[in-house]
Amino acid sequence: MPRTSPLTALTLAAALALSTSPALAGSKSSDHGHSHSHDDHAHDHSQDDKAEAIYKGYFDDADIAPRPLSDWQGEWQSLYPYLQDGTLDPVMAHKAEGGDKSAADNRAYYDTGYATDVDRITIAGDTVTFTSASATLTGTYASDGYEILTYAKGNRGVRYIFAKTEGDADAPAYIQFSDHRIAPEPADHYHLYWGNDRAALLDEVTNWPTYYPAGLSGAAIVAEMLAH
């Protein structure tokens, strides 16, 4: 896919989950897509189990619903600078404790995954602003449906897509969100993929710039990531 960046030599992105990036096996288009106490307690556990399954990429098509851009409203910061300056080292070490990669291997993996020169993203209404050290670009975006992605591992993800309707010429024609949710709900972090080729963006599996609320400190982000 094209790697041309709307902001200098920006690396473009595509599909994936937050903590792992399984190889993409294929994708499928979708929509442009009574007693209380004990029973309630069991119901709560059932809902928790379902939410966890969805987070891991296991869900029914019937559970998927369109989402508005307002789910990602706000000011967001890239994780990439925190990886580069060592703030995320405790996270890399924690992943190594329960996985088959060393902390150094994890850091190299995420160095590719998080890589981007877009340090800030602001989403207000239907307007998205991309800020890097060298440029600020703004576009107005409208929903262009969603795509269901199937990974080699067998789990799936839903990519929510928005198309530019007006704005700076160099602002990307498409932006695609992935945040482990499949129905309307405010995001607490997300991967954002952007570029000018809608279909090609779905094939990228190595670079997935990841954003957390701009108001969080590096230490707060580390604590949140370690809690998952």
Give the positions of each predicted feature.
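Short, hydrophobic/aromatic-rich segments at coil-to-beta transitions
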Residues: 75, 124-129, 156-160
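N-terminal glycine/threonine-rich, aromatic-flanked beta-hairpin/loop signature
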Residues: 88-141
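A charged, solvent-exposed segment within the mature domains of Sec-exported extracytoplasmic proteins
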Residues: 141-216
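Amphipathic/hydrophobic helical signal segments and adjacent flexible N-terminal regions
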Residues: 2-8, 14, 22-77, 81-103, ...
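A mature extracytoplasmic/lumenal domain signature
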Residues: 80-83, 127, 132-134, 145, ...
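Short amphipathic alpha-helical surface micro-motifs
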Residues: 52-60, 103-104, 111-113, 141-145, ...
